[in-house]
């Protein structure tokens, strides 16, 4: 039951009425949120519980139960309960509430209670304490992108190094250069591969540079960035706990209003990934006519 009235929720669901309404209101794609997105939101909730326990704002038993519930989610034990369609209205409110409700219900079970009672742990009053969709979702976007950065960079560094190695291996082979699909002036095959490696390196540098802006977090801005209902030390404590939980290098953002209202940093990071993809497509297009024969 919520202010709009009663609504049936599956008895075995860890989510609650807010999530159920979102399922009814936004049956758009039939997809579920990606795991990195869910993971990052749970990281934020875990860090918030630890922060509020540290400041004394949240009862230690409730905080410990929220942390334990978060750890279960992070161990992928409750994936089936994150059900809000990725395409939903607003700034991610339904996704935020899906996580709040799952953690609250599971925390209450761990404390000996039952699902749906929201006592002693409430999804809004405790799991979402001093938070808003408007600061958690922008922070989530930054964390989830940064969490995927390491594997991506490692993979492309391996490709770059392989291209550079082929550049050295093929440096004695002279071939006709190609412009407009016609023979041009001579060039060494090794030079071409060295150029592929150089382009990859430049693209990776742009990715890293754009990613660095994502390390500035606006968490603690609350609803509009001004930090209403938020303790003064909250942003710094959240940053410390998030660094410990995620293993990521993070910074307390200087202007939380700007970090909440603008997705420019995420758009710039996305553009560098798009540039990397374009480079790969271009390189493959270069190589295809060279390797297709005829063999001599």
Identify the residue ranges that each predicted region occupies.
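Conserved, well-structured ligand/cofactor-binding cores
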Residues: 1-296
């Amino acid at each position: 039951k919520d202010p709009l009235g009663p609504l049936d929720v599956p008895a075995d669901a860890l989510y609650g009425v807010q999530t159920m309404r979102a399922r009814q209101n936004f049956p758009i794609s039939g997809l579920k949120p990606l795991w990195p997105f869910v993971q990052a939101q749970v990281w934020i909730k875990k860090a918030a519980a630890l922060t509020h326990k540290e400041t004394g704002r949240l009862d230690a038993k409730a905080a410990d139960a929220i942390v334990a519930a978060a750890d279960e989610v992070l161990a992928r034990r409750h994936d089936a309960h994150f059900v809000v369609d990725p395409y939903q209205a607003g700034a991610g409110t339904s996704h935020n509430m899906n996580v709040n409700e799952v953690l609250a219900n599971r925390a209450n079970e761990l404390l000996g209670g039952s699902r749906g009672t929201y006592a002693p742990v409430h999804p809004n009053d405790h799991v979402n304490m001093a938070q808003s969709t408007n600061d958690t979702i922008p922070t989530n976007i930054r964390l989830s992108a940064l969490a995927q950065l390491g594997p991506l960079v490692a993979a492309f560094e391996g490709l770059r190094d392989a291209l550079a190695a082929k550049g050295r291996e093929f440096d004695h082979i002279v071939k006709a250069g190609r412009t407009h699909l016609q023979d041009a002036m001579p060039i060494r095959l090794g030079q071409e591969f060295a150029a592929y490696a150089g382009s990859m390196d430049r693209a990776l540098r742009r990715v890293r540079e754009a990613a660095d802006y994502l390390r500035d977090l606006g968490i603690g801005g609350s609803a509009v960035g001004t930090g209403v209902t938020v303790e003064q030390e909250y942003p710094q404590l959240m940053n410390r706990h998030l660094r410990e939980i995620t293993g990521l290098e993070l910074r307390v953002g200087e202007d939380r209003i700007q970090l909440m209202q603008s997705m420019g940093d995420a758009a710039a990071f996305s553009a560098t990934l798009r540039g990397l993809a374009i480079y790969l497509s271009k390189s493959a297009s270069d190589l295809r006519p060279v390797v297709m024969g005829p063999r001599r």
